[in-house]
Amino acid sequence: MMPVRTYHHHHHHNNSNNHRLRRIIPRVLLAVFAIYAVSFAAYLLRHQSPHPHPHPAADPERDAVDAAGGGGGGGAVDRVRVEAPSSQKPWPRLPSFLPWTSASVRPPPKHSCEGYFGNGFSRLVDVLPARGGGGGGWFRCHHSETLRSSICEGGRVRLDPGLIAMSRGGEPLDQVMGRAEEEELPKYEPGALQVEAAAKRTGPLVEAGFLDAYVPTGGIGMHTMRSLLDSGRVVPPGELHCSQWVEEPTLLVTRFEYANLFHTITDWYSAYVSSRVTDLPNRPNVVFVDGHCKAQLEQTWEALFSNVTYVKNFSGPVCFRHAILSPLGYETALFKGLSESFSCEGASAESLREKPDHQKTARLSEFGEMILASFDLLRDDILSSKTSNGLNVLFVRREDYLAHPRHSGKVESRLSNEKEVYDAIEGWAKGQKCKINVINGLFAHMNMKEQLRAIQEASVVIGAHGAGLTHLVSATPDTKVLEIISSMYRRPHFALISHWKSLEYHAINLPGSYARVTDVINELSNILKGFGC
């Protein structure tokens, strides 16, 4: 009987072992899986980045500094942190967008159309190279031989408002009437700009020879970007004393003629190009390094970019993880085209994708779309309904309004009988077979979204030579232009913009500033025939 009992006992023992194993194995597997999951999560957190930083060497240590800017990088806050997703606005999808930087895109030839409007900033000059092992700042410039200007950028860059002599900026207009323009433009003391070196290097950031080669004055009386670079100093590691850190990429911009739409659009274009050439993943912040008072156009800066402030609003020295110095508006193709002759015409991005041509450009259309998208106007429903209710003839008016502290509130008349011409067109339109809506473009009394919508919906834009016509950068490709030009203002601004946008352009050149109503109506009538009217 014993063998039988032994057999039964052994069988029972095996059963209990199997039972225990069946309980233990899942637990072991679960524990192994949990350890693996935790270590994988830790790995992800350690390597997480919401978007590729364009310059990984800019600041590898990533000091634990609040994204809003608090802390001077000392004491308890110096701990490694997980980078938060960007708070900056993403780039909108633009139908006319063409790549600015990519291995497959070769730099455009010097003095070509794309060299003027696109990424002709093809010469990279390393002023302060980033250290391979990390640590320290960096500084470099992208130079355009075509425009004879540079877009400069750096990491661990300090700007000290206390070393910039100018007005505070951003004040209400009525508080600063009569203030001289010189007071509003920056004068820098040495060290106003500082960049932290990776090694114990000190001294000027750049020499005079560098400035002459890469940031020449080019006939600009007060070249503030050159002056800012001239004030630049390199400081050793740990010597960059900051009251505040700005984590996000930031454009440093100095505006001239900031209340004038034409000059402001040159500033917007320069800021847009600077953002694309430096390959920013999102729309940057903007710091105005000027002391101009509040102006209506500031709202459009805020719509185009992520955040806008004045440098004098910072309470002390402010440091940037990534700062970009945007060239002056005077250095853009929009301005240089007034005095330099170059072959360039507008084309659709679609045609340039199929057949690249450096003597054609879609960049102004891309930029116009950027402005529209910033006001949520780049919508198919707006474009598809453009002519559903008749043809819009937009008459861009010049009217009196107080623009800046040195302004009388009166605008020079470029068309002495503007009201007579407007009334005559309105009367004539009512008698036509096809439906023509004459739109009274009192732009100085319309907000930017209303102005852009009026331009977008216009089949014909008509007006005396004046800054309001610069909105043509946002016109749709089928828009036709009629400019009435007095003998005192025979300048090519809007003929050129129309050409660079490939818009059909017509002009009436007046012997003085008085237009014969019949001449204007005859010209307008001929233009409308092109719409089958």
Curated annotation (Swiss-Prot):
Biased composition (Basic and acidic residues): 56-65
Stretches assigned to the Lumenal side: 45-533
Segments for region (Disordered): 51-78
Entry keyword set: Glycoprotein, Glycosyltransferase, Golgi apparatus, Membrane, Signal-anchor, Stress response, Transferase, Transmembrane, Transmembrane helix
Tissues expressed in: Expressed at the base of the crown roots and in the basal region of the shoot, which contains the shoot and axillary meristems.
Matches recorded under InterPro entries: Glyco_transf_61_cat (IPR049625), Glycosyltransferase_61 (IPR007657)
Underlying gene: RCN11
Subcellular location: Golgi apparatus membrane
Primary role: Glycosyltransferase involved in the xylosylation of N-glycans. Possesses beta-1,2-xylosyltransferase activity, transferring xylose from UDP-xylose to the core beta-linked mannose of N-glycans. Beta-1,2-linked xylose residues on N-glycans are critical for seed germination and plant development and growth under conditions of abiotic stress.
Protein name stated in the entry: Beta-1,2-xylosyltransferase RCN11
Molecular functions (GO terms): glycoprotein 2-beta-D-xylosyltransferase activity; UDP-xylosyltransferase activity
Originating species: Oryza sativa subsp. japonica
Disruption phenotype: Reduced number of tillers and reduced biomass.
Protein family: Belongs to the glycosyltransferase 61 family.
Glycosylation sites: N307, N313
E.C. code: 2.4.2.-
BP GO terms, sorted: post-translational protein targeting to membrane, translocation; protein N-linked glycosylation; shoot system development
Membrane-spanning segments: 24-44
Enzyme class: transferase
GO cellular component, as recorded: Golgi medial cisterna; Golgi membrane
Location, primary (coarse class): Golgi
Spans within the Cytoplasmic topological domain: 1-23
